[in-house]
């Protein structure tokens, strides 16, 4: 193969790769990053949207348990398969089955909603297509622990214990709590963070080790995820080896 043919092949291959990248940017998107289904509700909904203006996609939906196993009870995603034409919107509804009564009633249970986009068959031969998949947390919250008011904060009940280069965080609440970061400063940069993980989740009524750059601090800010997918922060103050939430007048204003 001469130099011109080689360059032509490389150029065509680059164009094909770019077209594939652009194609995968379009697809099925979800309108939230988590779902909370309470015992007081029959179902919870997630809105879907085909972000491509002209390419139709199939959206396949299912629920997994906390171990990543596909299940059909006590929660089920309906419809399991739907077609979304270009720019069309759709809905996935999470519905309870009779077995929901077998779940713990004194704490949340964790599941995952999966939505996989299935593109149409390619018109050209030898074209690689990728089916993208979204996976978001799905919490079942029994009626007995539904907060009295929307937006109530329970993340302030966490207690951190210093132990070497780690914190042991205790979650006495019946809720899953997702911690994004611990930082020396409010809205801190990466250099201000005590943690290096992208986020971790503490189960209800459980403890978890959190590795930190240093535990030699008198205070820090905890960024967490609330029911709406927001990332507020709480200030914690330390006395000796124990760190608890700071008084309300020291908390960030939102």
Curated annotation (Swiss-Prot):
One Gene Ontology cellular component: outer membrane-bounded periplasmic space
Alphabetical GO biological process terms: cell wall organization; chaperone-mediated protein folding
Presence of keyword Signal: yes
Alphabetic keyword roster: Chaperone, Fimbrium biogenesis, Immunoglobulin domain, Periplasm, Signal
Main location group: periplasm
Signal peptide bounds: 1-26
Localization in the cell: Periplasm
Family as reported in the entry's similarity comment: Belongs to the periplasmic pilus chaperone family.
The protein's role, per its UniProt record: Involved in the biogenesis of the PMF fimbria.
Name assigned to this protein: Chaperone protein PmfD
Organism placement in taxonomy: Bacteria, Pseudomonadati, Pseudomonadota, Gammaproteobacteria, Enterobacterales
């Amino acid at each position: 193969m001469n130099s011109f043919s080689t360059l032509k092949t490389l150029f065509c291959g680059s164009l094909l790769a770019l077209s594939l990248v652009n194609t995968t940017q379009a697809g099925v998107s979800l309108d939230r990053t988590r779902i909370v289904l309470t015992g007081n509700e029959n179902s919870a909904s997630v809105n879907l949207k085909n972000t491509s203006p002209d390419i139709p996609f199939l959206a396949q939906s299912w629920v997994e348990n906390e171990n990543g196993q596909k299940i059909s009870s006590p929660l089920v995603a309906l419809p399991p398969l739907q077609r979304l034409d270009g720019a069309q919107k759709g809905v996935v509804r999470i519905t309870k089955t009779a077995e929901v009564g077998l779940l713990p009633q004194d704490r949340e249970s964790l599941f995952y909603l999966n939505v996989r986009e299935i593109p149409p068959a390619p018109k050209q031969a030898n074209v690689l297509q990728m089916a993208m998949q979204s996976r978001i947390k799905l919490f079942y919250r029994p009626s007995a622990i539904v907060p009295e008011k929307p937006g109530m904060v329970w993340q302030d009940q966490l207690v951190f214990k210093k132990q070497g280069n780690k914190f042991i965080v205790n979650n006495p609440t019946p809720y899953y709590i997702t911690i994004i970061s611990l930082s020396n400063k409010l809205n801190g940069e990466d250099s201000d963070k005590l943690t290096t993980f992208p986020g971790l989740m503490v189960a209800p009524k459980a403890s978890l080790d959190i590795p930190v750059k240093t535990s030699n601090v008198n205070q820090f800010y905890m960024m967490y995820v609330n029911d709406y997918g927001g990332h507020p922060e709480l200030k914690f103050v330390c006395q000796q080896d124990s760190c608890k939430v700071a008084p309300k007048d020291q908390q960030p204003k939102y």
